[in-house]
C-alpha cells in the first residue's frame, strides 16, 4: 500500500496549516511552518489562487493528511458518513475521530497519529479487554481503551504520556494516566473538533 514517505513538514507548509504531524517538534520554534510559512518548492512563496474545485480538493487533501489516510480509507469513511443519519460532514469528522488510532493519539499514548497507528498495528492496545490491532476500528461511547501490560515499559509511550498535559485530552475522552487506560465518554460533537476544517467543501466535492 502506498504511503507518503517525504518530510511531513512539507505537508503542513503546503496546506498553510500546522497539522501537528511531527509530534513535539510542532510545539517548538523548529516547526517548519513557523520558519517558512509558504508552500514548499521553487515557486512556493507565491500562493496559487484555486478554482472552486481546487478549493474543495485542497480541503479533502488537508483532512486526509491530518488523519493520515489514503483515498480508499477516506472514501470509505465518507460513504459510511453519508449513509448515517444527520449531517454528512459532521458524521465524517466524528467517524475519523472515533478511529482507534485517533483515540490512542488523542488520549496521549502517541505523539502523532502515524505513531499511534503503528502502536495499534503492533498489538499494544486492548479495547474492552480484548486486543485490537486494526487502526480503523471504530470506538463507541463507553469503550475502554487500555495499554497491554507488556507494553507499559515502551519508552516512546511513556514519553508521550509525560507530554499529555501540554497537548491536553479532549472532553469526550477521559484518561487514567496512572492506569495506562482511557474511556470514550461520549461521541465527539462538532464543537470538540477544533482544527480549522470546512467539511462541507468535502461533501460538495464527493457529491459532484
Curated annotation (Swiss-Prot):
InterPro entries: Ribosomal_uS4, Ribosomal_uS4_bac-type, Ribosomal_uS4_CS, Ribosomal_uS4_N, S4_RNA-bd, S4_RNA-bd_sf. SUPFAM superfamilies: Alpha-L RNA-binding motif (SSF55174). The keyword Ribosomal protein applies. Keywords: Ribonucleoprotein, Ribosomal protein, RNA-binding, rRNA-binding. Residues 98-161 form the S4 RNA-binding domain. GO terms for biological process: ribosomal small subunit biogenesis; translation. It holds the Pfam family Ribosomal_S4. The keyword rRNA-binding applies. SMART domains: Ribosomal_S4, S4. One of its GO terms (cellular component) is small ribosomal subunit. GO terms for molecular function: rRNA binding; structural constituent of ribosome. One of the primary rRNA binding proteins, it binds directly to 16S rRNA where it nucleates assembly of the body of the 30S subunit. Part of the 30S ribosomal subunit. Contacts protein S5. The interaction surface between S4 and S5 is involved in control of translational fidelity. Belongs to the universal ribosomal protein uS4 family. NCBIfam families: PRK05327.1, rpsD_bact. This is Small ribosomal subunit protein uS4. It comes from Anaeromyxobacter sp. (strain Fw109-5). The lineage of its organism: Bacteria, Pseudomonadati, Myxococcota, Myxococcia, Myxococcales.
Amino acid at each position: 500500500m502506498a504511503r507518503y514517505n517525504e518530510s511531513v513538514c512539507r505537508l503542513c507548509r503546503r496546506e498553510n496549516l500546522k497539522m501537528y504531524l511531527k509530534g513535539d517538534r510542532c510545539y517548538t520554534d523548529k516547526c517548519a511552518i513557523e520558519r517558512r510559512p509558504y508552500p514548499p518548492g521553487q515557486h512556493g512563496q507565491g500562493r496559487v489562487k484555486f478554482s472552486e474545485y481546487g478549493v474543495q480538493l485542497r480541503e479533502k487533501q488537508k483532512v486526509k493528511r491530518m488523519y493520515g489516510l489514503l483515498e480508499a480509507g477516506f472514501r470509505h469513511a465518507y460513504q459510511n458518513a453519508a449513509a448515517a443519519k444527520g449531517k454528512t460532514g459532521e458524521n465524517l469528522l466524528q467517524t475519523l475521530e472515533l478511529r482507534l488510532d485517533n483515540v490512542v493519539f488523542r488520549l496521549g499514548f502517541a505523539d502523532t497519529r502515524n505513531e499511534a497507528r503503528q502502536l495499534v498495528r503492533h498489538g499494544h492496545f486492548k479495547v474492552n479487554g480484548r486486543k485490537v490491532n486494526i487502526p480503523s476500528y471504530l470506538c463507541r461511547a463507553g469503550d475502554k481503551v487500555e495499554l497491554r501490560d507488556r507494553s507499559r515499559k515502551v519508552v516512546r509511550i511513556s514519553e508521550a504520556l509525560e507530554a499529555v498535559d501540554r497537548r491536553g485530552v479532549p472532553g469526550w475522552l477521559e484518561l487514567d494516566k496512572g492506569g495506562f487506560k482511557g474511556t470514550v465518554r461520549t461521541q465527539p460533537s462538532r464543537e470538540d473538533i477544533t482544527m480549522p476544517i470546512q467539511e462541507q467543501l468535502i461533501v460538495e466535492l464527493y457529491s459532484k
